[in-house]
Design a protein with these regions (language model features):
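Helix-biased detector of long, well-ordered alpha-helical tracts
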Residues: 1-234
Length: 234
């Protein structure tokens, strides 16, 4: 086992092995819930690496800044976040990167925070061969506890959007659809590119969940973000 490499394990197996060092169910959701002074904090971290998750050929740095915030925000609201406090930004930057790229990235992040609430709380940076971005988002949990492990067999699954649009947008940007683009409507292409480059989590999601409850005593509901795909989410 000492000779095993991470690339041979895969993400799922790595998480399973690391979960034994964490509290029960800690790896079941995208956010950790911490009780502090009668409030629960929701904390989520996403990491993106150049040429693995992004590059300048498929996404503009301003769109990348927006997306970095909104993907984290989506994780928070799907865990019951009622107030988006803000983000910490960790950057690994190649010394040859132009300032303009960094500026555009932060402008995109600021636009997203201006739209959804929250501020840039701080962060850190270092140099590396390829650019990397780590965003830690923090929010306050409301009365509802939305956790993936609260789901039960035979319950109805409800989604808040159309799955596959972001993936199609990604493939379109990379010219890897293997499809005749003339068969795709202009509306579908536009929706797919917007979903990939400028995803917009639904801010009224939590309020709609509250309205749909059969009982006001029900505080735990099975829920998760599906940024990684519907199959992965369930």
């Amino acid at each position: 086992m000492d000779n095993e490499r991470i690339k041979d394990l895969g993400e799922k197996e790595l998480i399973i092995r690391l979960s034994k060092y964490m509290p029960k169910n800690q790896t079941k959701d995208d956010c950790a819930s911490l009780s502090i002074a009668h409030e629960n904090l929701l904390i989520n971290t996403d990491l993106m690496v150049e040429d693995t998750h992004f590059n300048d050929k498929i996404i503009h740095p301003k769109d990348l800044g927006w997306k970095s915030v909104t993907t984290n925000y989506s994780d928070l609201i799907s865990s019951g976040c009622v107030e988006f406090i803000g983000i910490n930004v960790g950057l690994i930057i190649n010394p040859e990167t132009k300032w303009h790229w960094i500026k555009e990235f932060y402008e995109g992040a600021y636009e997203a925070l201006d739209y959804y609430g929250g501020v840039i709380l701080g962060g850190d940076c270092s140099k590396g061969i390829k650019n990397g971005i780590s965003i830690t988002a923090i929010g306050l949990q409301g009365k509802l506890s939305l956790r993936r492990y609260s789901s039960r067999p035979e319950e109805i699954i409800i989604t808040t959007g159309t799955h596959g649009l972001s993936r199609l947008g990604y493939l379109l940007k990379r010219n890897k659809t293997n499809k005749d683009l003339s068969k795709l409507s202009g509306k579908l292409i536009s929706q797919s590119l917007n979903s990939f480059q400028r995803p917009k989590p639904k801010r009224d999601f939590l309020q709609n969940i509250i309205k749909s409850r059969l009982s006001t005593d029900q505080i735990e509901i099975g829920c998760t973000d599906s940024n990684d795909g519907f199959y992965q989410a369930v």
